[in-house]
C-alpha cells in the first residue's frame, strides 16, 4: 500500500475519475523498492483535474499536471494517444482517451507500462510487462527502431534502467539502440543534460557497468 496513492485515489474516485500508478511508480512498487518519483495516470483531463485539485498546469498542453504532496512532486498524466514525434521529444498532437489499452502504446518499455488500479490490481495491457519484470528484461514497446527514432533519449534511459535494476536488454531493443546511437548527437544539450545527469549518478553509485550498450 502507498500513502500518497491512497490519499489521491479517493479524491479522484469521489469526482468520478480513475487513478492508476504507472511508469516508474508501479515499477518500483512491484520491485519492492522505495518509490522515488511519483507518476500517476487518470482518465480525467487536465482541466477536469484542476477543478478539484490545486496543480501546476505548466505542461497542461502535453496532458500532464504536477501536484505537490508535502515535499513530493507528483506527475499526473491524462490517458492519451500521441501523433508522430517531430522534434525527437514531443508528439505532433495528443488526444485524450479513457482506455489504458491505447495509452500504454505511447510508453517506452514494457516494465513501465504496468498500471496499478485503486484496488492494487496489476493491469498489463502489453501482455509482456509482468513477465519482463519477473525476468528482469528491458523491452521497448512496439517497433524498436521506430520508437528509438521517435525519442533517442530512450537510449540513455535504457542504459540507466539496465544499470539501476540489473536488467538484460531484449535483443531487438539492443539492436535498435546500436543502430541509432548517432541520433543522440542531434539532441540539444538542454534536453539530453538531465538524462546524462541521471545516468552518471547511477554509474557513480554502482561504480561498474552491468550493461554495456
Predicted feature residues:
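Catalytic cores of the polymerase beta-like nucleotidyltransferase superfamily
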Residues: 1-213
Amino acid at each position: 500500500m502507498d500513502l500518497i496513492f491512497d490519499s489521491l485515489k479517493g479524491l479522484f474516485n469521489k469526482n468520478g475519475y480513475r487513478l492508476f500508478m504507472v511508469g516508474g511508480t508501479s515499477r518500483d512498487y512491484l520491485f519492492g523498492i522505495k518509490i522515488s518519483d511519483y507518476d500517476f495516470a487518470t482518465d480525467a483531463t487536465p482541466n477536469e483535474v484542476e477543478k478539484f485539485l490545486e496543480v501546476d498546469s505548466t505542461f497542461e498542453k502535453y496532458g500532464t499536471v504536477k501536484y505537490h504532496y508535502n515535499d513530493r512532486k507528483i506527475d499526473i498524466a491524462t490517458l492519451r494517444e500521441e501523433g508522430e514525434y517531430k522534434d525527437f521529444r514531443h508528439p505532433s498532437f495528443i488526444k485524450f482517451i479513457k482506455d489504458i489499452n491505447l495509452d500504454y502504446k505511447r510508453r517506452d518499455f514494457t516494465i513501465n507500462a504496468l498500471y496499478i488500479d485503486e484496488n492494487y490490481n496489476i493491469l498489463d495491457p502489453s501482455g509482456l510487462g509482468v513477465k519482463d519484470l519477473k525476468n528482469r528484461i528491458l523491452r521497448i514497446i512496439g517497433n524498436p527502431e521506430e520508437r528509438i527514432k521517435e525519442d533517442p533519449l530512450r537510449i540513455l534511459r535504457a542504459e540507466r534502467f539496465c544499470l539501476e535494476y540489473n536488467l538484460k536488454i531484449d535483443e531487438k531493443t539492443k539492436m535498435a539502440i546500436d543502430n541509432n546511437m548517432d541520433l543522440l548527437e542531434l539532441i540539444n544539450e538542454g534536453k539530453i543534460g538531465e538524462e546524462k545527469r541521471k545516468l552518471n549518478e547511477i554509474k557513480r553509485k554502482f561504480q561498474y557497468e552491468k550493461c554495456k550498450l
